[in-house]
Amino acid sequence: MIYLDHNATTPVDPRVVEVMLPLFTERFANPASKHAPGQEATRIVERARREVASLAGARPREIVFTSGATEAANLAIGGVLATAEPGRRRILVGATEHPAVLGAADAAVSAGSAVSADGTTAAERIAVHPDGTVDVDDLRRRLGPDVALVAVMAANNETGAVNDPRPLVEAARSAGRCCCADVTQALGRVPVEFERTGVDLAVSSAHKLYGPKGVGALIASKDAWSRLAPRVHGGGQERGLRAGTLNTAGIAGFGAAARIAAESMADDGTRQRALVALLTELLVKRLGPGAVELNGPVRARLPNTVNLRFVGAGADEVQACAPRVAISAGSACSGGGDEPSHVLRAMGRTATEARESLRFSLGRATTTEEIRTAADLVARAVLRVRSLSQSTPIQDEVRDDNRASSNSLNRGSAASKES
């Protein structure tokens, strides 16, 4: 299997596993305990806090550990709304945001803790340009005294589009509004400067940068901290903002992953950008320049990511015809629905064009040989999908072919045993 879906999740780095393992069976104490093992656990957590803060360009005291970016987004959005003035209840979110952010914002509007200018039950979407970057002019038009929060991602999970945070933060700050950035895909892949950009809140997750699943962080500036109300109540951990026994092993893994990412990010980015260019070149050469279209910016993009439309070939069918390559037709966090990508639709793609698009997201261990093989397999799959009769369900035919191949192999194995 050639795994090219690292924006969905990454394997845990063996060096991270090495840090985590002793914390399950040997150094397992609760960081809230006052005895020596508990204090050792506290030191482990605080070391990880410093490592995550360093990678994010933040201060350690600005890091709040959570169960992941989804919880962090809910804490950011719900926490700000809980303390917002009665006349300041609108939320503005980028149209291409991750489902975690969109879901949290829409839920706040549905529950009545937030409102939308048009009276709908969804948070207002800030338009994006055809390349997927946020339209700052549309943000400025929507800003008003009744806006509580602006949420815009640093880098998109489907197209890799990277937003310049400075004009977005300047627009929000000029109106005196709180600004939240989803840095989940950016952290560890491109430089993130939380304090320097002036963002109030940021959310992230360990499993996107070779750390464990089930741990993430909300980054909150000193000013934003005072605007947040906790969403989880209990023992008062994380300075009262996120109750619950700390996941020491997961947090330590997050810290180790952040430290490793800081050391390797520049070299990884250079190598992955070259491999993405090679992949695109090979596919265009094989299929023709008019048969492959780029979704997203040419340059302002994550170095490991490219989203391509294969004209006339459905993404699901291409995936079925290339089972040896793990690629994605959209966000893995959107519940696996059949709707076309909301990201590509917001960029102006038709439903058909969106359904013909696939995301390739490379990883730290991706090789040139894997890219050449993947390009060949995907190109073959695209050509096959186009050649198959429209009257034949492609996925059914592929399953039949795979079953026949499996039966043939089984017969060969049985014959070998008989002989």
UniProtKB/Swiss-Prot annotation:
Pfam families linked: Aminotran_5 (PF00266)
A Gene Ontology BP annotation from the UniProt entry: nitrogen fixation
Annotated EC: 2.8.1.7
Segments of skewed composition (Polar residues): 404-413
General function of this protein: Catalyzes the removal of elemental sulfur atoms from cysteine to produce alanine. Seems to participate in the biosynthesis of the nitrogenase metalloclusters by providing the inorganic sulfur required for the Fe-S core formation.
Presence of keyword Plastid: no
Species assigned in the record: Frankia sp. (strain EuIK1)
Protein family membership: Belongs to the class-V pyridoxal-phosphate-dependent aminotransferase family. NifS/IscS subfamily.
SUPFAM superfamilies with a match to the protein in the record: PLP-dependent transferases (SSF53383)
Name of the protein: Cysteine desulfurase
Residue positions of the active site: C333 (cysteine persulfide intermediate)
Obligatory cofactor(s): pyridoxal 5'-phosphate
Catalysed conversion reaction: (sulfur carrier)-H + L-cysteine = (sulfur carrier)-SH + L-alanine
Gene3D superfamilies: 1.10.260.50, Aspartate Aminotransferase, domain 1, Type I PLP-dependent aspartate aminotransferase-like (Major domain)
Keywords: Iron, Iron-sulfur, Metal-binding, Nitrogen fixation, Pyridoxal phosphate, Transferase
Binding site for pyridoxal 5'-phosphate: A69, T70, N157, Q185, S205, A206, H207, T245
Entry GO MF terms: cysteine desulfurase activity; iron-sulfur cluster binding; metal ion binding
Self-association and partners: Homodimer.
Enzyme class per UniProt: transferase
Modification N6-(pyridoxal phosphate)lysine occurs at: K208
Region entry Disordered, spans: 392-419
